[in-house]
């Protein structure tokens, strides 16, 4: 480039249009009339500075004088010593406080508006360029004013928040200083004696934490901000750094470490020193902060007090879950339970009372947790009233001793022949029927009379309105008759006595009335309130009178129920049908049960797929007091469970699952207790007790329950009946595998094994027995149990000889001259020598003679000579017992 450079030539050098270069020169405050004018070096540098400022770069170039800096940052360091209390001693800590302040210079362009270049009216193009430049400058100025206003509002908002925080900080510091003084006073006073009163968690939480500078409260001006700033003014808010006093910082650390043990504080202190570096890094802020922590960490080593926790526990909880709630190790929880005498593992379940005791022993509190949300929702469903109660049919339960004619009476009323088809001629499950009579509909429940079906009869008495007690006129009052009276009284149900079999020649109805007087059942003719009806189920005599008595009693009771709305009731019997699945016989007590309803039944739920009455018809709905069979449940419910109809399947499923979880936890608690009881029992009884494992499958739930109770009751000190599994339905492959594993006897009551189960049973030699009568089950189990007991060896004395004289023999030694005073003495049997009724020797005969002849036996009132083998101390007056050992089969 030559010394004289024109605007046109400069535009060619920088590859910029001439018009744009003229605009840039005008923006830099230099006026030129045309592109042929000369541009000096000073004007070039001024244009370069303008362009740099426009594009956000510093106006610095080689060969020019550096302008004054726009920002100046001052750093100040101040060292001070802090004295920290460490128990009885005091420790001095060096603290370095750093302060940084930045001053920003405001450009003159914001205070002085650049003068407008004169406009030459002759040059129209220059006028247009200057007009555009003026508009651009005005827009930039308006934008800068808007941004300045936004910054001003933001600064005012930050200032307002800062003042509020300072006011709150003053209040917190007052509280902190007061509480810390109390803590330090207590700490100094307790340096000799142990801590007597723990600091509560609430008080610890009340301590304010030291406010540290946050990014929002301390905006720092970094080097990148200096380089990238567009000239805007950024003020640093006051109060962005809060100087923390030594006393407040040490008190904060002391409060934060109250829950740590001495070992944990030492370990934390060492980790802090390691992370912060050594003393050579103490000049840095992080190293200084960590050095303060590590120097004060050992200053408050005090005995700590355990935190008292309050946890909510339901009816049951596992040991591991309770330990987790109390923030303890599971092993420590097990040790605490062992000390209390409860031997459990971490996976076992304990009840609520045990959890309360062990938690109080460990210094914690336990409250009862409510886990019945779904049950409450279900209760709200049942409490809703759907309509006015209207009269309903009575529910009558037929009870009495076995073979007294209960089912025969129902057969005559229903015109059926059920008793003929029952196994053994006895009823072994509850039968539910409803009969339409001239006097209205009556629902009958036929209960078993065998002693094993006590729980069945108890359930029948609870859900009934009237109990008809059937007593045979020729047999009188029997044990199950007395039991039926007790069930009726326990349920508060009126009693009607039906004296059956009056057509027999040996019938004595008066005897029945007299015997029932001992059970406080007084007939009306004797001044009581119990109706007695004499009848015969064979001839039909008196049956109408019984129906009249039932109708009269029902009118007196004024039985009513709501017949619309959601149905509720009770399960009478349940079974597992191979083709239909779980089947439950239910008695509706309120509302109307319809097909498609969702219901909860114990731990099972489902949707009613079909309804069947006792004759196999499918009614559209079941009203109160009507028994029906329900199909569609998820499992076989227990007899006696209540059912409730709900709106949706979700609620039914939640309630059933919650009940199943509670039952499982309760079963775990019971089984754990039973295991410990079994261990202690085995320790006391030794190894003599035999165990008979049984696997029982039955057709209905009621029979299964009765079988289990009757068989378990056979256990005694010599043998224990252990029922490993019970279930409703046929014997499956899994049942057979369980029997093989546990070496159990399989009992099928009115059920059979399928093909796969039979194959496993035959291959492994499992004892499988089928029954249809409960008497046979009990007798067979007794025989099997007796076989396990083996035989018992008994000793039976067959003869006694009295020693009258003693002779000496060179061959046998001492020979006793005896008189047989009882029984017979045989040579092949063992003997005992008694002196003053005390056994002095037990052995065998070496010689038995009479008149110097060897004989095999000597009978009563006969003299003989007895030589005792290997015993020569026989004396006059001794007694010699001859006995034999016999084997006796042991029975239950």
From Swiss-Prot:
Binding residues annotated for GTP, in chain numbering: 400-407, 446-450, 500-503
Region of interest (Disordered), ranges: 144-176, 189-298
Domain tr-type G: from-to ranges: 391-560
Keywords: Cytoplasm, GTP-binding, Initiation factor, Nucleotide-binding, Protein biosynthesis
Compartment(s) of residence: Cytoplasm
Main location: cytoplasm
One Gene Ontology term of the molecular function aspect: guanosine tetraphosphate binding
One Pfam family named in its UniProt record: IF2_assoc
InterPro entries recorded: DNA-bd_dom_put_sf, EF-G-like_DII, EFTu-like_2, IF2_assoc_dom_bac, IF2_II, IF2_N, P-loop_NTPase, Small_GTP-bd
PROSITE patterns named in the record: G_TR_2 (PS51722), IF2 (PS01176)
Compositionally biased spans, kind Low complexity: 207-219
Entry function: One of the essential components for the initiation of protein synthesis. Protects formylmethionyl-tRNA from spontaneous hydrolysis and promotes its binding to the 30S ribosomal subunits. Also involved in the hydrolysis of GTP during the formation of the 70S ribosomal complex.
HAMAP family according to UniProt: IF_2_B
Family stated for the protein in its record: Belongs to the TRAFAC class translation factor GTPase superfamily. Classic translation factor GTPase family. IF-2 subfamily.
Protein name in the entry: Translation initiation factor IF-2
Species annotation: Xylella fastidiosa (strain M12)
Highest classification ranks of the organism: Bacteria, Pseudomonadati, Pseudomonadota, Gammaproteobacteria, Lysobacterales
Gene of this entry: infB
């Amino acid at each position: 480039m030559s010394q004289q450079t024109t605007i046109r030539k400069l535009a060619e050098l920088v590859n910029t249009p001439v018009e744009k270069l003229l605009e840039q020169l005008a923006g830099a405050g230099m006026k030129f009339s045309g592109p042929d004018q000369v541009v000096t070096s000073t004007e070039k540098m001024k244009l370069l500075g303008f362009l740099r400022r426009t594009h956000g770069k510093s106006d610095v170039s080689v060969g020019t004088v550096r302008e004054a800096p726009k920002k100046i940052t001052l750093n100040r360091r101040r060292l001070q010593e802090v004295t920290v209390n460490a128990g009885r001693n005091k420790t001095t800590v060096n603290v370095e406080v750093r302060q940084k302040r930045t001053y920003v210079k405001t450009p003159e362009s914001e205070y002085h508006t650049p003068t407008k270049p004169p406009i030459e009216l002759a040059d129209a193009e220059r006028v247009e360029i200057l007009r555009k430049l003026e508009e651009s400058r005005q827009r930039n100025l308006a934008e800068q004013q808007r941004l300045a206003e936004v910054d001003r509002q933001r600064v005012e908002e930050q200032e307002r928040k800062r003042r509020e925080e300072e006011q709150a900080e003053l209040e917190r510091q007052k509280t902190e200083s007061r509480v810390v003084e109390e803590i330090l006073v207590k700490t100094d006073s307790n340096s000799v004696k142990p801590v007597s009163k723990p600091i509560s968690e609430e008080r610890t939480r009340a301590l304010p934490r030291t406010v540290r500078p946050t990014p929002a409260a301390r905006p720092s001006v970094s080097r990148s901000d200096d380089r990238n700033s567009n000239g805007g003014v950024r003020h640093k808010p006051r109060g962005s750094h809060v100087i923390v006093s030594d006393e407040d910082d040490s008190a904060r650390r002391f409060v934060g470490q109250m829950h740590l043990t001495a070992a944990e504080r030492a370990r934390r202190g060492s980790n802090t020193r390691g992370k912060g570096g050594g003393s050579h890094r103490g000049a840095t802020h992080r190293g200084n902060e960590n050095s303060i922590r590590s120097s004060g960490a050992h200053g408050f080593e005090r005995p700590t007090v355990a935190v008292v926790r309050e946890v909510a526990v339901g009816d049951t909880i596992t040991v591991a879950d309770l330990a987790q709630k109390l923030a303890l190790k599971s092993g420590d929880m097990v040790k605490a339970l062992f000390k209390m005498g409860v031997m459990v593992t971490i996976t076992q379940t304990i009840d609520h009372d045990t959890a309360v005791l062990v938690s109080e022993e460990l210094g914690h509190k336990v409250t009862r947790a409510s886990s019945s949300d779904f049950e409450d929702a279900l209760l709200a469903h049942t409490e809703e009233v759907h309509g006015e109660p209207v009269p309903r049919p009575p529910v009558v339960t037929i009870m009495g001793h076995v073979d007294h004619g209960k089912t025969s009476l129902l057969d005559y009323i229903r015109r059926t022949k059920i008793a003929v088809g029952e196994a053994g001629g006895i009823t072994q499950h509850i039968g539910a029927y409803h009969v339409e009579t001239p006097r209205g509909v009556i629902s009958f429940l036929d209960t078993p009379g065998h002693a094993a079906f006590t729980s069945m009869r108890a359930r029948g008495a609870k859900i009934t309105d009237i109990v008809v007690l059937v007593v045979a006129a020729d047999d009188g009052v029997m044990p199950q008759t007395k039991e039926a009276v007790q069930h009726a009284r326990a349920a508060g149900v009126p009693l009607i006595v039906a004296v059956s079999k009056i057509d027999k020649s040996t019938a004595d109805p008066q005897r029945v009335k007299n015997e029932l007087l001992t059970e406080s059942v007084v007939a009306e003719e004797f001044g009581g309130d119990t109706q007695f009806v004499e009848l015969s189920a064979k001839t039909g005599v008196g049956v109408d009178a019984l129906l009249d008595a039932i109708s009269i009693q029902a009118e007196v009771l004024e039985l009513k129920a709501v017949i619309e709305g959601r149905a509720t009731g009770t399960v009478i019997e349940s079974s597992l049908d191979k083709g239909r699945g779980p089947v439950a016989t239910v008695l509706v007590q309120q509302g109307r049960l319809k097909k498609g309803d969702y219901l909860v039944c114990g731990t099972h739920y489902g949707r009613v797929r079909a309804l069947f009455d006792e004759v196999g018809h499918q009614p559209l709905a079941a009203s109160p007091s009507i028994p029906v069979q329900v199909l569609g449940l998820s499992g076989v419910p227990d007899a006696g469970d209540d059912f409730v109809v709900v709106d949706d399947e979700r609620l039914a499923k939640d309630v059933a699952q919650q009940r199943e979880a509670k039952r499982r936890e309760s079963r775990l608690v019971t089984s754990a207790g039973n295991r410990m009881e079994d261990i202690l029992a085995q320790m006391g009884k030794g190894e003599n007790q035999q165990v008979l494992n049984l696997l029982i499958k039955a057709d209905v739930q009621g029979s299964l329950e009765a079988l289990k109770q009757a068989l378990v009751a056979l256990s005694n000190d010599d043998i224990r009946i252990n029922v490993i599994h019970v279930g409703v339905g046929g014997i499956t492959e899994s049942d057979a595998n369980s029997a093989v594993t546990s070496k159990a006897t399989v009992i099928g009551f009115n059920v059979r094994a399928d093909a796969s189960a039979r194959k496993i049973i035959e291959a492994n030699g499992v004892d499988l027995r089928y029954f249809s009568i409960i008497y046979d089950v009990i007798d067979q189990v007794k025989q099997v149990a007796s076989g396990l007991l083996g035989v018992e060896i008994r000793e039976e004395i067959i003869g006694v000889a009295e020693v009258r004289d003693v002779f000496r023999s060179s061959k046998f030694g001492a020979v006793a001259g005896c008189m047989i005073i009882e029984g017979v003495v045989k040579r092949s049997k063992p003997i005992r020598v008694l002196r003053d009724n005390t056994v002095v020797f037990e052995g065998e005969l070496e010689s038995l003679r009479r008149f110097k002849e060897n004989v095999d036996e000597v009978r009563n009132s006969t003299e003989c000579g007895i030589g005792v083998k290997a015993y020569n101390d026989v004396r006059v007056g001794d007694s010699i017992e001859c006995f034999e050992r016999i084997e006796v089969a042991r029975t239950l």
